[in-house]
């Protein structure tokens, strides 16, 4: 899917990780090449010439990447391809038992690119230091949790969060419908994406309590799916323990964005809109002009994220962190 392809794009642009193999049981190698090369959101791939060497090998410039088309994860020969880390981005194998099938093929670690009900969840910049080498299967949480958690961490560390509600205004994704169609578990989710604002559930705010235990039970939220193809925005409305002016809050976020959270949390005072963040690799970019305070204890904070590119960048960051700890 899109995250798998974009994780591959991110990996190929970085020196600290090597892409050695991809698995997709549903498409041919030449179609895989086409899907990788042309992207309606992120544009054409321009970094290496991409060629099909044969049906089991892609060439990115001189670099060869093995291609598998195996449906059952335990049959994929990851070890033979030299893969240490597998990114499980099908959206199907999101619990530990299912994702563990990759280990049977010789992978050493599996990173699930979705929230997981039972795998340890990590948000880079927030709790990745709690990763231990004995964890073989981990989750990179969701794109929205990756946007919300760094912001919530800064606010909670500096001012304390009594409680909060989050809304994400979220671009459409592949699970939605182009025209009205059946969606048994989520009736609204079956409505046409291109001209509806669709209220939806999200576990992203509650999941912050898993990566930041101090906030467990203090946050919840919902989503509106809107007809944009990429980039989403979190609205976090919180009650603060310590009184703070909006300028105090801005200053704290700016300081963290230039310090420990540089590259993860951004800060802007420009008059930005969503397309300004297409291709932004940061998890969360605080929009200082969009937020507003009602009082010294009650404030609405707004933060943007490229829910595809930013998230895919964090998948690779998490892998690099895991490798450094091993």
Curated annotation (Swiss-Prot):
PROSITE patterns: GAPDH (PS00071). GO terms for cellular component: cytosol. InterPro entries: GlycerAld/Erythrose_P_DH (IPR020831), GlycerAld_3-P_DH_AS (IPR020830), GlycerAld_3-P_DH_cat (IPR020829), GlycerAld_3-P_DH_NAD(P)-bd (IPR020828), Glyceraldehyde-3-P_DH_1 (IPR006424), NAD(P)-bd_dom_sf (IPR036291). The keyword NAD applies. D-glyceraldehyde 3-phosphate binds at residues 142-144, 173, 202-203, 225. Pathway: Carbohydrate degradation; glycolysis; pyruvate from D-glyceraldehyde 3-phosphate: step 1/5. Its EC number is 1.2.1.12. It is found in: Cytoplasm. The active site is at residue 143. NAD(+) binds at residues 2-3, 24, 71, 307. Plants contain two types of GAPDH: cytosolic forms which participate in glycolysis and chloroplast forms which participate in photosynthesis. All the forms are encoded by distinct genes. This is Glyceraldehyde-3-phosphate dehydrogenase, cytosolic.
């Amino acid at each position: 899917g899109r995250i798998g392809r974009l994780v591959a794009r991110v990996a190929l642009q970085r020196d600290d990780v090597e892409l050695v193999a991809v698995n997709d049981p549903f498409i041919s190698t030449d179609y895989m090449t086409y899907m990788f090369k042309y992207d309606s959101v992120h544009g054409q791939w321009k970094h290496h010439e991409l060629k099909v060497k044969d049906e089991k090998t892609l060439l990115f410039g001189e670099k060869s990447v093995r291609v598998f088309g195996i449906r059952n994860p335990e049959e994929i020969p990851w070890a033979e391809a030299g893969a240490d880390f597998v990114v499980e981005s099908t959206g199907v194998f999101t619990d530990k038992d299912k994702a563990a099938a990759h280990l049977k093929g010789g992978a050493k670690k599996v990173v699930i690119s979705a929230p997981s009900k039972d795998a340890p969840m990590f948000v880079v910049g927030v709790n990745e230091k709690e990763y231990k080498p004995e964890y073989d299967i981990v989750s990179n949480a969701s794109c929205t949790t990756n946007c919300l958690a760094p912001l919530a961490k800064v606010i909670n560390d500096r001012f304390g969060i009594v409680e909060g509600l989050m809304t994400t205004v979220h671009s459409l994704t592949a699970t939605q419908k182009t025209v009205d169609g059946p969606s048994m578990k989520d009736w609204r989710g079956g409505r046409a994406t291109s001209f509806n604002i669709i209220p939806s559930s999200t576990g992203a705010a509650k999941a912050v309590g898993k990566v930041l235990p101090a906030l467990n039970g203090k946050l919840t939220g919902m989503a509106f799916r809107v007809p944009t193809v990429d980039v989403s925005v979190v609205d976090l409305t919180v009650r603060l323990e310590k009184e703070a002016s909006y300028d105090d809050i801005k200053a704290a976020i700016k300081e963290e964005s230039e310090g420990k959270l540089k590259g993860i949390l951004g800060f802007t005072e420009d008059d930005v809109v969503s397309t300004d963040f297409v291709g932004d690799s940061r998890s969360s970019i605080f929009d200082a002009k969009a937020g507003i305070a009602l009082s010294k204890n009650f404030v609405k904070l707004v933060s943007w994220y490229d829910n595809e590119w930013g998230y895919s960048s964090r998948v690779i960051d998490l892998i690099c962190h895991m490798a450094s700890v091993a």
